From Swiss-Prot:
Keyword Nucleus in record: yes
ZnF C2H2-type: positions: 192-209, 240-262, 369-391, 397-419, 425-447, 453-475, 481-503, 509-531, 537-559, 565-587, 593-615, 621-643, 649-670, 676-698, 704-726, 732-754
PANTHER family: C2H2-TYPE DOMAIN-CONTAINING PROTEIN, ZINC FINGER PROTEIN 200
Gene: ZNF786
Organism listed in the record: Homo sapiens
Record-linked PROSITE patterns: KRAB (PS50805), ZINC_FINGER_C2H2_1 (PS00028), ZINC_FINGER_C2H2_2 (PS50157)
Alphabetized Gene3D superfamilies for the sequence: 6.10.140.140, Classic Zinc Finger
Protein name per the record: Zinc finger protein 786
GO biological process, one term: regulation of transcription by RNA polymerase II
Pfam families: KRAB, zf-C2H2
KRAB domain sequence ranges: 9-80
Matches recorded under InterPro entries: C2H2-ZF_domain-containing (IPR050636), KRAB (IPR001909), KRAB_dom_sf (IPR036051), Znf_C2H2_sf (IPR036236), Znf_C2H2_type (IPR013087)
Amino acid sequence: MAEPPRLPLTFEDVAIYFSEQEWQDLEAWQKELYKHVMRSNYETLVSLDDGLPKPELISWIEHGGEPFRKWRESQKSGNIICSSVDMHFDPGFEEQLFWGSQQAMNSGKTKSHFQLDPESQCSFGSFVSFRPDQGITLGSPQRHDARAPPPLACGPSESTLKEGIPGPRNLDLPGLWDVPAWESTQHPWPVCGESCWENNHLVMHQRGHSKDRTRRAWEKFNKRAETQMPWSSPRVQRHFRCGVCGKSFRRKLCLLRHLAAHTGRGPFRNADGEMCFRHELTHPSHRLPQQGEKPAQCTPCGKRSLPVDSTQARRCQHSREGPASWREGRGASSSVHSGQKPGSRLPQEGNSHQEGDTEALQHGAEGPCSCSECGERSPMSARLASPCRAHTGEKPFQCAHCTKRFRLRRLLQVHQHAHGGERPFSCRKCGKGFAKQCKLTEHIRVHSGEKPFRCAKCGRNFRQRGQLLRHQRLHTDEKPFQCPECGLSFRLESMLRAHRLRHGGERPFSCSECGRGFTHQCKLREHLRVHSGERPFQCLKCDKRFRLKGILKAHQHTHSKERPFSCGECGKGFTRQSKLTEHLRVHSGERPFQCPECNRSFRLKGQLLSHQRLHTGERPFQCPECDKRYRVKADMKAHQLLHSGEMPFSCECGKGFVKHSKLIEHIRTHTGEKPFQCPKCDKSFRLKAQLLSHQGLHTGERPFHCPECDKNFRERGHMLRHQRIHRPERPFACGDCGKGFIYKSKLAEHIRVHTKSCPAPNELDIKKRLSQLFAMIEADWS
């Protein structure tokens, strides 16, 4: 191919002029930046040709004049004037220019890239690229109408593609070539006669006719994405450049994928044999339209794609078979024309793998592959593996750091961000980072309070769609997650995973302080607050603080007197669902918690834990004032009230109690109620402990054993009273003579000796005294 002749280039070919109105609309720093670029262009041309005369524009700039021209004067002189100019600079220059930074004037950068908008209402437009290391590239536009001025000083081109459309030419500078013009006659606009390559480009071009011609070039460029030509530079910086072909990328991963094309490992090669591609669909999309090449047209829908070679790829979207590379993960599976959603279930038909079946998938045809479990169809076998793994439970992608497994590779990649600490998406309000864009979108709703997902049955709103789906299972009573070992079903998959850990006895999350294990990490975080004393949840009405949010919500019901959970049998109300569940065991008699040592069963788990401390002798709760220790925390709190003298529970008779249960027992003395009845002798008692002690008379059982003298007792109180005999201590001492006594009643009798105030006993006192005496004799001789 013969080299095109070199043509001269003048400063006017690369100069950009503004009208007076446009110049007045520019800001001061924008004017200075424009002057800086024009001077840089002139200095480069002077370095190539010392005899170049100084243009009038440069003289204006040097003398401090206003470098603008009037429209009519510029038409007479043949200069280029455009009412709407797109100015494209290199990424660093461009970002400083359009974001208000004046550092561009002092940055020392000399690269610039001007491009006249091909859709704007210009008298003439050109594509000018100025790079000191590559020379100057000038490209002529496609438009050729009566308003275009005479050709530039560089002279006519020797080759043209069509009448009135200039072809490629070599300018009179080393390494400078004219950019080939794109021919597109598919979407003409009758107003100006200009054609656009894509239909959406034509729509954007039509908007240019309705815009004000005096709109500032800077505003026009700020929306350059709407009219950007294929060769224009994006605003996002591309730091990673290919050393082979010079192509730039925003991310290093994209550059590495691109470099694989130069290694020759790909099975598909372009027409020039220069690059290889790993996917067949990537191969035709690499080629840009050449001069005279028309866009390819899709047979089913008539839509045109870029190169002719991509017709086959586009038909693959419509046909049920398609090439193997398309079926393996590069093709789109959405039915554009039929409205069929990706992955939706289509009706079963015959064999969908027949060769030559060109019925359009996007026009309502089926995909070639279907899932044997649920019948879900997919045009790609690789995509089909995803729904199948949902049924088989297969998770082939394993994390190298924590051995977690995933069904999809992309889920593994997102998970790996957690190990690397990488959270590329951050919230602007609170700075919290996220590994996925969708998680950031969900988090933003926390600040905005938006809850777009509404339950159709109860009207409750949710921030996330997953929360709505989980909530709807409450209405349908759906429990899709079943344990394969015991058959129990659960609403949530996380509940099933936690349940399965119980079968294996595995507790992967353990406390570093006490060694206690948990099945959930959130439970471990809640437990750590026990050691740290942290109570982050505060009541707004009484300033009480709580470790758990659920306890705070239950506490808030006490202020409103609201008890939303009520028993269906007795009507008793509760502030929490868990308390109602515990109460229902009273009616059903269920005791699911059994002690492994004595086989005793309990209604509540806390009761079992407290009981097990009897076997171990553990007393973890210590009074900070007198160092007494207790098995139950409630007993320790009641004991602390004795030190403070506080009696929060008082009876109408004025007597106070430290426990609510003691108040209830005391009230029965006023009412005469005896709810505990012996099933053998029909005798009734006020207290449950009295009933248990009485039942020992019928059974002869004496479960409480003295370790000193091997005596047995029916009641624990009798055993404790007896153990004082073996101790040398006399806790009750007389204040007058200092004599000590084991029992307080003995001290009271002794005090009467000193006061000589022994009244004659009445009949009631005699009976009470005799009963106490018989009980002591029975305890000592049994």
